[in-house]
A protein has these predicted regions:
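Carbohydrate transferase catalytic cores enriched for Leloir-type hexosyltransferases
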Residues: 1-318
Length: 318
């Protein structure tokens, strides 16, 4: 079987959607080796987290070929890619990040789309109006046209039915996993080297995730203010909300107790997870919450929110 993936996030994103895309490709190409896997991406970035495909003789990378498609990469990904899929004799196409291309439903290619969350509908004030309209159009259209929908949690399945009016029988819940790097014990010398490299003390709290309003990092910082000498390590990045957090840190003289990191290798992340006292994940809402899973596999306790998907990611049966 020849399986195509929308692999843009796998190449260009090192957070949630990228992790999901890479892990899906990695697991399928390893355990179902007789298939042929085609990774379609508008840009082929060298991403060390995709190093496994170099040894895979069953995995191939495809990028836009014509000058038109190279120039209008978004148009290629959302529509013109269908011709390439047909020419490559793709049997199944999997939209790994909430969408499938227009017109694919008119071909013989079977389609699967993974929907991660509908946060833009639940919390509209966190998104620009134009972005909400684009997301709604893409998500709903993709769900209606796809042969099968994967929801990453029961909460996401419920939202797809409620907000997009999609029949339940079309949706299957398949929980996300996490990279094997978090399932292996990191040697003490590697932990020590990593902590020394980033000037991290031995006793610290950990936050992992993008730095945006719904993730609620500011709540951790306000609590940190009441915990003298407690250190916090933040792995993630952001824009306006990060500036808000940085201002709070400056105003409350917390700059020597908070360390911001990004662009870490999986080995470094594993070492920091496993060395932490606990991981705090106070997000308002998620589609799943991979950092919870990464922390549990790292044998590090987690404090997270109630409701939504959090009991699925970190509950008794997680």
């Amino acid at each position: 079987m020849r399986i195509g993936f929308d692999a843009k996030r796998a190449f260009l994103n090192n957070t949630g959607l990228g992790n999901y895309s890479r892990d899906t490709i990695r697991v399928l190409s390893h355990f179902h080796y007789n298939n042929r896997y085609f990774l379609y991406t508008p840009i082929k970035n060298e991403n060390p987290r995709l190093s496994f495909i170099k040894d895979n003789k069953n995995t191939f990378i495809r990028t836009p070929e014509s000058l038109f498609n190279k120039t209008l990469k978004s148009y290629w990904r959302s529509k013109n890619i269908v011709k390439d899929l047909f020419n490559n004799k793709i049997d199944i196409y999997h939209g790994l990040s909430n969408e499938i291309p227009l017109g694919i439903e008119k071909t013989s290619i079977k389609t699967v789309v993974t929907i991660h969350d509908l946060i833009f509908i639940r919390y509209p004030h966190l998104f620009r109006t134009i972005d909400r309209k684009i997301y709604y159009t893409k998500f709903k259209s993709s769900c209606e046209r796809a042969d099968k929908i994967i929801a990453v949690s029961k909460q996401t399945k419920k939202d797809i039915i409620e907000f997009l009016n999609i029949p339940e029988k079309k949706i299957t819940v398949i929980y996300q996993g996490c990279n094997d790097a978090f399932k292996s014990i990191v040697a003490n010398n590697i932990k020590n080297i990593t902590l020394a490299k980033y000037k991290i003390a031995n006793q610290y709290l950990l936050y992992v995730g993008s730095i945006e309003e719904r993730k609620n990092l500011l709540t951790i910082l306000k609590t940190l203010k009441e915990l003298p000498k407690q250190m916090l390590v933040v792995i993630g990045n952001g824009k306006s909300y990060k500036l808000k957090c940085l201002n709070f840190i400056k105003e409350n003289d917390l700059h020597d107790r908070v360390i911001f990191l990004s662009g870490l290798s999986l080995e470094e992340m594993s070492a920091i997870y496993q060395s932490a006292q606990l991981m705090i994940y106070p997000s308002i809402f998620e589609g799943f919450g991979i950092p919870i899973l990464e922390s549990l596999f790292s044998k590090t306790p987690v404090i997270t929110s109630e409701g939504g998907c959090f009991s699925e990611a970190g509950g008794l049966n997680s």
